[in-house]
Amino acid sequence: MSYLRYYNMLDDFSAGAGVLDKDLFTEEQQQSFMPKDGGMMQNDYGGIMNDYLGIFKNNDVRTLLGLILFVLALYSPPLISILMIFISSFLLPLTSLVITYCLVTQMYRGGNGNTVGMSIVCIVAAVIIMAINVFTNSQIFNIISYIILFILFFAFVMNIERQDYKRSINVPIPEQYTCNKPYTAGNKIDVDIPTFNSLNTDDY
């Protein structure tokens, strides 16, 4: 006689018939190991397409726009760069933008003592704000600190504008447009100029 003739394996699982998936686990169990909804994009368009469409779900577009504005601010006139950094601060942290802008500007522009000093002040202020934000999450502090940091950054950019203006005034004149020949004042005509004493009136 076959073993299956007197033993039905489905009898041991009769209790599972009609039980829904949501009844098998508690809410805590589902949160611990069940897949989260919205964690990954459905593979409806293929793997490569999902990589491109995923930027709309992970704030990558926001970061990309902020970086584009920041790069344009680096190569724009100082006054326009203030506006671009201000817009970028809504997309990226202002502290990171200020630190990077000050470092890059000093690397390829250089500057005098005032510009270097203001860049150091802006960087130190941004680092302090970042450090305090680690221990506190006060929105009032963030607003006040960002206003102070933006004022310092504005003063730094205005120093750069003033420095560029002085450089434009003190542009050296090319040698081909300058006169390098020696010049001495005096009579340039190599002839004798008659005077009343040199006139001979005896002949008349």
Swiss-Prot record:
Domain of life: Viruses
General function of this protein: Envelope protein which participates in virus morphogenesis. Needed for an early step in viral crescent membrane formation by interacting with OPG125 scaffold protein. Its interaction with OPG125 scaffold protein leads to the formation of rigid, crescent-shaped membranes that assemble around the cytoplasmic virus factory. Acts as a membrane anchor for the protein OPG154. OPG144-OPG154 virus envelope protein might be involved in fusion or attachment, and can further associate with OPG153.
Modified residues (Phosphotyrosine): 204
Name used for this protein in its record: Virion membrane protein OPG144 precursor
Positions of disulphide bridges: 102-122
Region (Binding to OPG125 scaffold protein): 1-38
Gene Ontology CC: membrane; viral envelope; virion membrane
Site feature (Cleavage) residues: 16-17, 186-187
Membrane topology: Multi-pass membrane protein
Membrane topology, Virion surface segments: 1-66, 161-204
TM ranges: 67-87, 140-160
InterPro entries noted in UniProt: Poxvirus_OPG144
PTM summary: The 23 kDa precursor is cleaved into a final 21 kDa form by the OPG083 protease during virus maturation.
A single GO BP: DNA-templated transcription termination
Residues making up the propeptide: 1-16, 186-204
Keywords: ATP-binding, Disulfide bond, DNA-binding, Helicase, Hydrolase, Late protein, Membrane, Nucleotide-binding, Phosphoprotein, Transcription, Transcription regulation, Transcription termination, Transmembrane, Transmembrane helix, Viral envelope protein, Virion
Organism listed in the record: Monkeypox virus
Family: Belongs to the orthopoxvirus OPG144 family.
Subcellular localization(s) per the UniProt record: Virion membrane
Subunit relationships: Homodimer; disulfide-linked. Interacts (via N-terminus) with OPG125 scaffold; this interaction helps OPG125 to associate with membranes. Interacts with OPG140. Interacts with OPG154; this interaction allows OPG154 to be anchored in the mature virion (MV) membrane. Part of a complex composed of OPG144, OPG153 and OPG154.
Major localisation: virion
A Pfam family that the UniProt record links to this protein: Pox_P21
Alphabetized GO MF terms: ATP binding; DNA binding; helicase activity; hydrolase activity
